[in-house]
């Protein structure tokens, strides 16, 4: 990677998240907007990326071809869909480009493809790039070690009506953090739905509840409930800019790293707390 500004490419430049990623890239010192990508046939192709994001003219035009932009970026930032992200991943691996991946909804094969690619390129892959969410994940680990063995644990998440995967990647990351702290595998203790006559709650399980409504940016709560008291740890996002800023900060953090799989807790050095 270059010693000067880190040049980033933004996937899905015309989407809600893409536009805020462009704004964040233009605002952070040490980062340069190098390229912006949209799907073939999009009416936004040829547009100025900065103007598209409401940030003024940048001279970076929206393209549809990875080959056309391959010399214009060092790190590719992707918050799109799993199938598209995996195509971008293969390209970045072939050409030695770093990646910041905020896409959620990967199946196990997709996650394995990311792990495999990290042998050759540096990747930050996180369910949520908010600083607050990642601090919350650390707090959940601590709470689970103290209270997790004797409380009922439930995770409740809410997002806007357009979100296509459930539970959210962040909710799953919360469950994984709690399960790991309890020396469990989430797939063995997660309960993703309850309907009809379910019987009493099974001890040691982690329940999930999902809300999809309106324009909710993202709300997540983990509940540790006992008889007589309960602890709730909650994060509420009011703007997607918190995710965009974290993603661009992660791209800058990748400078000088040739390979490896990292998450936002590495970027924030939370693993040493």
Curated annotation (Swiss-Prot):
Ligand binding (NADP(+)): 39
Record-linked InterPro entries: DapB_C, DapB_N, DapB_N_CS, DHDPR_bac, NAD(P)-bd_dom_sf
Keyword Cytoplasm listed: yes
Residues annotated as binding NAD(+): 12-17, 38, 102-104, 126-129
Pfam families in alphabetical order: DapB_C, DapB_N
Similarity-based family: Belongs to the DapB family.
Quaternary data: Homotetramer.
Protein name: 4-hydroxy-tetrahydrodipicolinate reductase
